[in-house]
Swiss-Prot record:
Keyword tags: Amino-acid biosynthesis, Aromatic amino acid biosynthesis, Glycosyltransferase, Magnesium, Metal-binding, Transferase, Tryptophan biosynthesis
The keyword ATP-binding is assigned to this record: no
Enzyme Commission (EC) number: 2.4.2.18
Cofactor names: Mg(2+)
Chain sites annotated for binding Mg(2+) 1: 91, 225
Pathway in which this enzyme or protein is active: Amino-acid biosynthesis; L-tryptophan biosynthesis; L-tryptophan from chorismate: step 2/5
Positions with a binding annotation for 5-phospho-alpha-D-ribose 1-diphosphate: 79, 82-83, 87, 89-92, 107-115, 119
Name of this protein: Anthranilate phosphoribosyltransferase
List of residues binding anthranilate 1: 79, 110
Subunit description: Homodimer.
Organism: Bacillus cereus (strain ATCC 14579 / DSM 31 / CCUG 7414 / JCM 2152 / NBRC 15305 / NCIMB 9373 / NCTC 2599 / NRRL B-3711)
Cofactor binding annotation: Binds 2 magnesium ions per monomer.
Biological role: Catalyzes the transfer of the phosphoribosyl group of 5-phosphorylribose-1-pyrophosphate (PRPP) to anthranilate to yield N-(5'-phosphoribosyl)-anthranilate (PRA).
Superkingdom per UniProt: Bacteria
Length: 341
């Protein structure tokens, strides 16, 4: 670890292979906590590259719980969090809209870190059992079309690092890589990030991970979701090419809405919002979900255009299919899946 620390002190970038090896050392129980803290702070001060992010992602995925990865066509729409906007659970609500539209959603997530309610907190409030094994997750993806992967359970080697991150109380590379460490072999991905300057590096990492298609968005007001407030900056990965563009919600028929108007609350309050959206109630919450789910359906290749994605998202809700997916996941996740144990 000392050689990597010296490079970082000198402001030099690590190669992908160096970062991979450093990542394995970070997960080694014999390394000193002071070394872990120093590494994370120095890396943050220097600024992370796509190669460094990918190297660490390789190490974390290697040490994650093993999956059979026989499920084809899975997608995740997990964002980084960390924008501090205290919005309702946009991506988790959107996940059921995607599932209702026929996308297999492997939703990677955690409890609240910078918000009041994380995806795990919301799903528990709704009645979903978030404690699923890899074999149970495979079953849910195949038979329900959506499953939740509780990040701490998927990455047990990260327990000590989580403690150190909390003690440091400053953003580190781990604030960026959550969506990139999903242990399921995803084909497509929709990622919201809170740092605009990391749009391209994250897209490059998704390309290295072999995603067929992906879309990375930094919303107006630096939201880690697409926002109705104004211009959204996106990077699209398609046909192994990366294209940068901006998206104005007004172009797609939405009225502009300030981010403050889509704030959430505790798990009970956010569960109420999610159920209202999935039940077809018209609101700014629904419009926000339609924009994000529409972009995700486009990123998945389910539709050829963003406009078609938004229309399909609306149909998923208004037909009752999105809500049906939630109800099915509640039942299936709480069953004793003896057939896969």
């Amino acid at each position: 670890m000392n050689s990597y620390l010296r490079k970082l002190v000198e402001g030099k970038h690590l190669t992908e292979e160096e970062m991979y090896r450093a990542g394995l050392l970070l997960l080694n129980e014999n390394i000193l906590e002071s070394e872990i803290a120093a590494f994370l702070v120095l890396l943050k001060a220097k600024g992370e590259t796509a190669e460094e992010i990918y190297g660490l992602v390789r190490a974390l995925r290697e040490k994650a719980l093993p999956f059979s990865n026989h499920i084809q066509g899975a997608m995740d729409n997990c964002g980084t969090g960390g924008d501090g906007a205290q919005t309702f659970n946009i991506s988790t609500t959107s996940a059921f809209v995607l599932a209702g539209a026929g996308v297999k959603v492997a939703k990677h997530g955690n409890r609240a870190v910078s918000s009041k309610t994380g995806s795990a907190d919301l799903l528990e409030e709704l009645g979903v059992n978030i404690s699923s094994t890899p074999s149970e997750i495979d079953y849910l993806l195949e038979h329900v079309g959506i499953a939740f992967l509780f990040a701490p359970a998927m990455h047990p080697a990260l327990t000590r690092i989580m403690k150190i991150r909390k003690e440091l109380n400053v953003p580190t590379i781990f604030n960026l890589i959550g969506p990139l460490t999903n242990p399921v072999n995803l084909e497509t991905q929709f990622v919201g990030i809170y740092k605009r300057d990391m749009l391209l590096p994250v897209a490059q990492v998704l390309q290295k991970l072999g995603r067929k298609q992906a879309l990375v968005v930094n919303g107006s007001g630096f939201l880690d979701e697409a926002s109705l407030q104004g211009e959204n900056h996106v990077v699209i990965l398609k046909d192994n090419e990366i294209v940068e563009m901006s998206i104005d919600p007004e172009k797609y028929g939405f009225s502009r809405v300030k981010n403050e108007e889509i704030r959430g609350g505790n798990s009970k309050e956010n569960a109420k919002i999610t159920l209202e959206v999935l039940s077809g109630e018209k609101s700014v919450y629904r419009d926000t979900v339609l924009l994000n789910a529409g972009l995700a359906l486009f990123a998945n290749g389910k539709t050829e255009t963003i406009e078609e994605g938004i229309k399909l998202a609306a149909h998923s809700i208004d037909s009752g299919k999105a809500l049906a997916k939630l109800n099915l996941l509640i039942v299936a996740s709480n069953e004793k899946l003896e057939r896969v144990n």
